Amino acid sequence: MSIQDLQRKSVEYRKTILKIIHHAHAGHTGGSLSCIDILNVLYNHVMNVSPDTFDDPTRDRYVQSKGHSVEALYTVLADKGFFPVEDLDTMEQYGSHFTGHPTRDIPGIEQNTGALGHGLSVSVGMALAAKLDKRPYRVFTLLGDGELTEGSSWEASMTAAHYKLDNLVVIIDRNKLQITGPTETVVALEPLADKFAAFGYAVRQCDGNDIAALVETFDRVPFEPGKPNLILANTVKGKGISFTENVVAWHHKVPTDDELSRAMAELDRAAAEIEVMA
């Protein structure tokens, strides 16, 4: 898929995210919009996983540790054909499997997540299993920067480096905001890249909302033999909509009818700009 095709996907994915959150009257808007470009590139360019290969023991694995941004994951899985997109209309309804965090009841989801700080530990176990079983699959996991205050993330990091898990790719959605404010105000994380390097990762940084930059970075994995890979993806919370970008309140805010209409108009303009550049 070309860069422009991926850019088109991101616009459509953002529309879907906003529609399902608006319809459900619940969801995590800001974090889903910040990470959707990452998921787009993973599922449409990087990973060997599809509805046809999901039972294949050699498939790549994806674990969304920042489970609260599940709307982004649901959007991509529906587009890939794991389930009909119409199923998303049931999100957050009584009896629906489409809840506010990922569960294995949904086709295409590898692991239940939601309690922050656990996804990396699970991913390390999967990557170690691949090494022990001599299987070629890779394990990708997406963490929010806010969950890095969980000690389990650093325990898992030490383990990943100890076992030289160069088949593990950790992506940090570094949007610099969490539910109560800026990460550097809540619990300062910087110098984050240096910390991960000290824990034994091969670290690379990129613009996590730039499709071309993401493609280039993922294409270089593994970065260094014998080291787990870490991509520090610098993103914007609420990316793609002028009035949601870098606004703490949009962590869990649901768009009103008027806000949804305005957002759709902005995304239509973004789509038109892509066509002009084609």
Tell where the protein language model's regions lie, with residue ranges.
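N-terminal capping segment at the start of a domain
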Residues: 10-26, 173-175
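Short acidic, glycine/serine/threonine-rich loops at helix termini
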Residues: 74-75, 103, 152-154, 180-184, ...
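Thiamine diphosphate
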Residues: 108, 112-115, 120-223
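Glycine/aspartate-rich loop-and-adjacent alpha/beta segment that forms the canonical ThDP
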Residues: 211-278
